């Protein structure tokens, strides 16, 4: 039987204007476009690394 993977809710709380191009690309990779947009993503090491990369722009909840 497979278990449901854990999800993390990620919300973009600061604007991407003036940030590094790589950080903008990371936010887009997570599916975040506008301020206050939220997505639920699977809890994987890759996703956690992306969140850590842009920690100052997002808020995350388990």
Swiss-Prot record:
GO cellular component: cytosolic large ribosomal subunit
Protein origin, superkingdom: Bacteria
Keywords: Ribonucleoprotein, Ribosomal protein
Gene Ontology biological process terms in this record: translation
Oligomeric form and interacting partners: Part of the 50S ribosomal subunit.
Matches recorded under HAMAP family: Ribosomal_uL30_B
Protein name: Large ribosomal subunit protein uL30
Organism: Nitrosospira multiformis (strain ATCC 25196 / NCIMB 11849 / C 71)
Gene name for this UniProt entry: rpmD
């Amino acid at each position: 039987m497979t278990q449901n993977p854990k999800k993390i809710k990620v919300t973009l709380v600061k604007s991407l204007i003036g940030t590094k191009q790589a950080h903008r690309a990371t936010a887009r990779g997570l599916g975040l476009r506008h301020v206050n947009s939220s997505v639920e993503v699977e809890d994987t090491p890759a996703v956690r690394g992306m969140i850590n990369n842009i920690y100052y722009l997002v808020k995350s909840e388990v």
